[in-house]
Amino acid sequence: MAMRQTPLTCSGHTRPVVDLAFSGITPYGYFLISACKDGKPMLRQGDTGDWIGTFLGHKGAVWGATLNKDATKAATAAADFTAKVWDAVSGDELMTLAHKHIVKTVDFTQDSNYLLTGGQDKLLRIYDLNKPEAEPKEISGHTSGIKKALWCSEDKQILSADDKTVRLWDHATMTEVKSLNFNMSVSSMEYIPEGEILVITYGRSIAFHSAVSLDPIKSFEAPATINSASLHPEKEFLVAGGEDFKLYKYDYNSGEELESYKGHFGPIHCVRFSPDGELYASGSEDGTLRLWQTVVGKTYGLWKCVLPEEIASENSDSIYSSTPEVKA
């Protein structure tokens, strides 16, 4: 019998959703933040998509957003030449970090004491959040605007991507360790601490590299241009989305395409697995986020598995469906 994937649709944004990030698992569950060109990043309950609040204060498109591990702080990167740090519990703005150009990416260290930023001025900046008045440390070397910058190796190193280059930096010496060059634009980058894996997308390719050495591990080709990909926490599956509005799910070990789903009405800009691996979230040009089950038919969050005998009295269709009770 077929199992029907029924995504939860999270509305509220008015422009394309360009970035999203999950927190770690906290005593209150886990959380999801989304960055949008409407300039209003939103915080949601991660497993249901329920809206918690909107961070108000940016005066331009928000290109990047992240949460610290315990979801007490949020950070956002925007076209108004600022990065902002927020109290994710109260929604209050804690600090504004002025830049000289559009900011595209933000990332907290594990202890939440430092914030890494990158953007159109080609510089990486490291802010000490306990000394907001202090000038940030700056790392130069990129030759085009920085799209993504991430702490790695327990914050001892930094990974960053510009148009066609991924670079690995040593935090202590602020110097470049190694770089990777691509023949087309790098569209996304994800770092998996368990196993030190780096996921890079460019063109139709989804490539996996060692985050320590940048050596290649494996790569897959998708049927369409891919904008983002995410590896399951247990490294069983990966999901990817891009220009053809579809989400693809692959077996990480064999590279076999397991499923593909169309739910968005525009290109997919970002996709990430939840920290427990039970779902993945996607953000699109259509202004929505959607939450998808990793294992269709499992009762989890707002999804409840309805068996054929339970719906026989309502209709004669015997398709198994994993149906959300309400829309977020």
Region spans (language model):
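WD40-repeat beta-propellers
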Residues: P41-Q45, A83-W86, V106, L124-D128, ...
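Terminal intrinsically disordered, low-complexity extensions flanking WD-repeat/beta-propeller proteins
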Residues: T225, E259, F265-P267, P275-E278, ...
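A short beta-strand motif characteristic of beta-propeller blades
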Residues: T6-C10, D50-F55, D92-T96, E133-I139, ...
